[in-house]
Amino acid sequence: MIILVSPAKKLNEERARGQATTVPRFLDQAAELAGVARTWSEDEIAKLMGISATLAKLNKDRFAAWSGDGQCAAGLMFDGDVYKELEPATFDDVTKDAAQRRLRILSGLYGLLRPTDAIEAYRLEMGRKTPGHPAGTLYGFWGDKIAAAIVEEARELGVGSVLNLASEEYAKAVPPKALGDLTLISPRFEEERGGSRKVIGVAAKRARGAMARWVLENGITEADDLKGFTVGGYAFDAETSAPQRPIFVRG
């Protein structure tokens, strides 16, 4: 079982610097995208990403400085809600090894990352357009490349399933049809409030991080074993779940 998670907007360069030991699979493609992004003005970046002028300047400067010679480990660089529960910095050696083999971070700029892949600070969400590039969007740019890489890695590991713990925005970069015979499992985490159930964004992100860690620490390899996930008070709901859409409820 290969595990997919999203990156995060919030970064921790200090923690990640000097910890990278591997080169991203799609470094050439990242360089191509960074070259395109380098041509964007601060105003364009602000509009494309829906961010403030201050953040637009920061990211304009990041693209200008991007060299392809990253020094920060991807797994330690990202610092959002998913990573507060995943906590790669606290993995023991066995879990680190499992994460390097099985955990993959989807990225708008780098495509697909291992925890120790060397990256530079950036912001480029997967759902964005790419003015100046004929693909038009990041989905168009990546096409089936990411899915093909996952299929190749799954074959090398001898596994038959992918645990999708990424957000909808990032999961769209991995079309199920492009995964061939691999089974795509996409858990859903719901909160029960006042007699109704719904997905709450922050809670779902943390639950995805917690499940990723739980799977790695416990050596979970079969989809059926995911039913045992109870971290954070969640419980598997057999009545509303489907084989490729297990639902976990808390409340």
From Swiss-Prot:
**Where is it found, in Gene Ontology cellular component terms?**
cytosol
User: In which domain of life is the source organism classified?
Assistant: Bacteria
Q: Which residues form a coiled coil?
A: none
Q: Which Pfam families match?
A: H2O2_YaaD (PF03883)
Provide one Gene Ontology biological process annotation. Answer: response to hydroperoxide
Family recorded in the similarity comment: Belongs to the UPF0246 family.
* Matches recorded under PANTHER family: PEROXIDE STRESS RESISTANCE PROTEIN YAAA, PEROXIDE STRESS RESPONSE PROTEIN YAAA
What's the protein called, per UniProt?
A: UPF0246 protein TM1040_2658
